């Protein structure tokens, strides 16, 4: 009975949020910019949440968590939905948890990026870790479910089709850009059957870093933006010219969202390639994004998944957390 009452309350909150957002309309792509429902340019700056299922298990998927993200200055949060976690907790329970999360995000004035968080080669169903295991059938099912469930939820503004495509990891098979482009277009077409308004985010290879193929063979669908994950060790310093050649040039024509950035010191918890750096990277990447009008979310608003933004569940900022909290709050106040 208590569960029924709770779900009725969640449904009521979501209905109210939907009514409010319907009056505002959807974020859309115009040229190389995101535009809010009032016609103003919108730059997304926010935080990557770890998997909703993980956070439920940790007892941290709650309003306090979302309120803290908003207090840091985020205007967007990213839900990293791992296929194996979705199946472990169950689709119904996971989506019910995300319903509540979307209501909290809307309450605190934040948009949501829905991220199908797998790493590897979707064409050949070969992945870098069992937690990312999925296939095309399940991927289409996920996006049908998202598009149907949230077709009246403009808070869920961005659909990140596939987290990190790669064919250079061990045993990840083969896939050309033309093949991957076609798969992404099929997923977008599936989404658009149920929700023609959502902006779809498309990534390139090399763990979603490389967007060079977009120069000659862009995604042939409207209302799309591109993703890159320019962690500090993807290229050696000086970074800017290489960033421009690898992904930044795309922002001259289409919106770009770097849905994962971040760093940690060499001696900090979880330090690994390609994230080891200092706040020198933080200064360079944020200055570059401002110059190019690139949106971003920082990985990861969690105590375990590195590079972490927080050291504990009192939300004590880590080294990168101190840098990005100050930066986000400054931008939010402008």
Region locations from a protein language model:
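Extracellular glycoside hydrolase catalytic/binding regions
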Residues: 26, 58, 137-158, 162-295, ...
